[in-house]
A protein has these predicted regions:
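Structural signature of hydrophobic alpha-helical transmembrane segments
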Residues: 40-56, 76, 100-111
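C-terminal ends of transmembrane helices
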Residues: 57-70, 117-127
Length: 205
């Protein structure tokens, strides 16, 4: 069985921002990603709210997972996520009511975002508190950056580009971002593949 070295904080950051970006690689949270990214204002608000929930839920999962029975662990994580989302929603409603109105139903729907529960269950519950917090920050930033990119493009081009502010435009822009990422990965790996020596087939004596 191959040995898998433990992850370092740099590995966790790299996964969240690039290698396992939740928006461009794992394709998690597509519903709010496409629906809310109509402007930088709403994209930034949802990105920060999701980041806060990810950090909080990851911290709780890392601390309490060792004392939970497998049968109730998912339910406890969902309750923790719901509590974090409620706290964030109340804070935004009190301090930024305009943003709260702009996000609408998608703010409480962070509870159902599969990204949040997936990180709590698959990573944070199996890692120490420090790595769980870093993972929450990295995944939140990775998700938020994709939101901001989509929001910026749709806000700049929305009034002059057909469908840019509508859901079909969001799908098209996300597809272009995925294509750009795949092109960059292929361009990066092509030189290493070309430099690999070819081994000629030898007849068996």
């Amino acid at each position: 069985m191959p040995y898998n070295p433990p992850m370092t904080p740099a590995d966790v950051l790299r996964n969240g921002l690039s290698a396992s970006n939740p928006g461009l690689v794992q394709l998690l949270g597509l519903c709010p990603l496409l629906a809310v990214s109509t402007s930088i204002h709403s994209a930034l608000g949802l990105g920060l709210a999701t980041l806060a929930v990810l950090v909080t839920s990851n911290a709780i999962a890392s601390v309490v997972a060792r004392w939970l029975l497998p049968e109730v662990r998912i339910a406890v994580f969902v309750l923790a996520i719901a509590g974090a989302v409620t706290s964030v929603q109340l804070a935004i409603a009190a301090w930024w009511p305009d943003l709260h109105d702009a996000l609408g139903i998608f703010l409480p729907l962070i509870v159902t975002n599969c990204l949040v529960l997936a990180r709590a269950e698959s990573f944070a519950s199996r890692q120490p508190l420090g790595l769980a917090l870093i993972d929450g920050v990295a995944m939140g930033l990775g998700f938020g950056l994709v939101l901001l990119a989509l929001g910026a493009v749709r806000e700049l081009l929305g009034h002059g580009l057909l469908l840019a502010l509508l859901p079909p435009g969001a799908f098209i822009l996300l597809g272009l971002m995925l294509a750009l990422r795949n092109w960059r990965l292929q361009a990066r790996t092509a030189p290493s593949e070309a430099a690999r020596p070819e081994i000629a087939d030898r007849p068996v004596a």
